[in-house]
Design a protein with these regions (language model features):
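Class I SAM-dependent methyltransferase Rossmann-like catalytic core
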Residues: 14-22
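N-terminal, positively charged/glycine-rich alpha-helical extensions of SAM-dependent methyltransferases
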Residues: 1-13
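Conserved alpha-helix/loop element of class I SAM-dependent methyltransferases that forms part
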Residues: 23-42
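A short SAM/SAH-binding and catalytic strip from SAM-dependent methyltransferases
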Residues: 109-123, 146
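A short acidic, Gly/Pro-enriched loop at the edge of an enzyme's catalytic core
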Residues: 99-110
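Conserved Class I S-adenosyl-L-methionine
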Residues: 4-6, 24-25, 51-53, 172-265
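Class I SAM-dependent methyltransferase SAM/SAH-binding core
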Residues: 43-101, 125
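Conserved catalytic/acceptor-binding region of the Class I
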Residues: 124-125, 131, 135-204, 220
Length: 265
C-alpha cells in the first residue's frame, strides 16, 4: 500500500498545504466543476476532500456538499476554512474512508475525487462507491496527475529510496487516459471522457520553491519526518542539490498537468 494512502503524510502537511497550495489547486477544482456541468444548487460528494479545495468553491456557488477525508488534520483545516468563510451550514465534512462512503445511495448530482482516489489501496471499491452515491445521470469526476519528470521525478525518486511505498520517479496510478477510462467504466460509469488540464506553478527563486516543498509536498515532508532532524541535515541538502541541478536558481515557472476523468452514473 502506498504511504500516501495513509493519514500520516497528509496530517503532517495539513496546515501549510491549506495555506500555500490552495490557489494552485483551486484552478484544477474550478475546471472539474465546470466540466461536470451540474444543475443549479447540486448535491455534491467530495471524496478525499483535503482542506476543502473543491467543496468550498462549490458551496460558495450554492451546492450542498458532503465531504470526507482520511486525515483528521486535513478535516480540521477544512472545518476552520468553512467556518471562516461562513459556509459551515452548506458542508458536512467528516473523517472517513473513501472506499466505504457513509453517504446515502443515489442522492448526489456529482461525486468528485481530486487527486485522492489515485492513492486508494482499492481504487475499484472507491469508484464503485462514487457510482453508488450518484443519482442516475449524475457525474463522477476523478482527477489524477499526468506523469511528471525533471525536478519532481528526482524528488520522488530520492524519497522512494528511503520511504517504502512511495512511487519512484513520480509515477502514480491513473496516470494515463486508458487506465482512467477502463477503471471508471468497470465501476459502471458510462461515456467516460478524459480531459487534460494544465496549470503553472510559479516561484520567485529556487529557494522559495524548495522551502515550500519542504512544508507542503507530502512525500518530501513524510521523508523528512521519517528520517529525523539529524539525518535530514545531511540528506536534505543532497536531495535539494539533485532537484536544483534540473531547475536552476529561478525565477521558476513549472508546468503541471492533470487528467480529469468524467463518467455518468
Amino acid at each position: 500500500m502506498s504511504a500516501l494512502a495513509t493519514a500520516e503524510p497528509w496530517d503532517l502537511v495539513a496546515v501549510n498545504y491549506a495555506a500555500e497550495s490552495l490557489p494552485y489547486l483551486e484552478a484544477f477544482a474550478r475546471e472539474a466543476l465546470r466540466l461536470a456541468a451540474l444543475p443549479p444548487r447540486p448535491r455534491i460528494a467530495d471524496i478525499a476532500a483535503g482542506p476543502g479545495t473543491l467543496s468550498l468553491l462549490a458551496a460558495a456557488d450554492g451546492a450542498r456538499v458532503s465531504a470526507i477525508d482520511l486525515s483528521p488534520r486535513m478535516v480540521d483545516e477544512f472545518r476552520a476554512r468553512s467556518g471562516a468563510g461562513g459556509m459551515a451550514g452548506a458542508v458536512d465534512v467528516r473523517v472517513g474512508d473513501g472506499q466505504q462512503l457513509p453517504f446515502e445511495t443515489a442522492a448526489y448530482d456529482g461525486a468528485f475525487s481530486m487527486f485522492g482516489l489515485m492513492f486508494f489501496p482499492d481504487r475499484a471499491a472507491g469508484l464503485r462507491e462514487m457510482k453508488r452515491v450518484l443519482k442516475p445521470g449524475g457525474r463522477a469526476v476523478v482527477a489524477s496527475w499526468i506523469p511528471f519528470d525533471g525536478p519532481f521525478s528526482a524528488l520522488f525518486q530520492a524519497a522512494s529510496e528511503i520511504v517504502p511505498g512511495l512511487p519512484a520517479g513520480g509515477g502514480f496510478a491513473l496516470s494515463d487516459e486508458e487506465s482512467i477510462v477502463r477503471e471508471m467504466s468497470e465501476a459502471g460509469l458510462a461515456n467516460v471522457a478524459v480531459h487534460r488540464v494544465a496549470q503553472e506553478l510559479k516561484a520567485p527563486s529556487f529557494d522559495a520553491f524548495w522551502n515550500s516543498m519542504e512544508r507542503t509536498n507530502a512525500p518530501l515532508v513524510l521523508l523528512k519526518h521519517r528520517v529525523g532532524a539529524e539525518r535530514w541535515q545531511t540528506m536534505g541538502p543532497k536531495i535539494r542539490e539533485r532537484v536544483a541541478a534540473t531547475l536552476g536558481e529561478g525565477p521558476l515557472t513549472l508546468g503541471r498537468g492533470a487528467f480529469l476523468g468524467i463518467g455518468i452514473a
